[in-house]
Amino acid sequence: VKDGGSTDGSLEQLPADSRIRVYTRPDSGIYDAMNQAMSYVTGQFVQFLNCGDLLHDDMVLERLAAVMERKRSRGADGEGLGHKEKERIFYGNQYHEAWGSVIYSAPEVNDFTCYRNVPCHQVCFYDVRLFAERGYDVKYRVRADYEHFLYCIYDRKAEAVYVEMIVADYEGGGFSETRENRRISEKEHAEITKRYLGRDKALRYKLLMLLTLAPLRTKLAEDEKYSEWYNGIKAKIYGRCGHKDEPGE
């Protein structure tokens, strides 16, 4: 647990467990805190959960570990001796508590996925090597996790592996959802997509989003009355066109 020096008594709510370690150090914000937390990570993969985020159930880590091991074994068979294991991001779906619905991630990460909507960091398990050269770029106040995901895909050539399961529960009403930060998010999104996709491709995708009524679809996805219906349709579309690693294979 990385704490920035909270005084609201939240640390006292942690259960007594020898596996929990608390590191307290001042930080300048969410992404700076996450960068600091990386210095304490000792495993092969890392996931970030922020205030209000929870693993969906007690079996998430066990099921994901099984998928990771199968993928590692298959990769080892194909990569041969002397080759480093491929850097990967394993990701799944998110349950949005405020909307009362599952937010399904795209089963395939391509250029359009990277423009439109990548998986949120709460449902991603990153190979720690993807943070070896650099962490989150804190100049991005709202979109640093988005920028880092594109860095992993385009600069580090990481493989994104979709696992069909709900990984994390998101409380809703978070940092990125305020009106001011939504405006900042749009500006940062334009800068980041131009950098990784190029101006022409980013413009084509922006026009495509407008032609397919993206603003209306966003309102449907965020409306408590229609969110479950909309995301259910999206899940069916994803199921027909994507590939996945099943946790129960």
Spans of features found by a protein language model:
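Weak global preference for isoleucine
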Residues: 20-22, 30, 89, 103, ...
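Membrane-proximal basic amphipathic "stem/tether" segments
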Residues: 194-249
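Catalytic core of nucleotide-sugar-dependent glycosyltransferases
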Residues: 165-166, 178-204
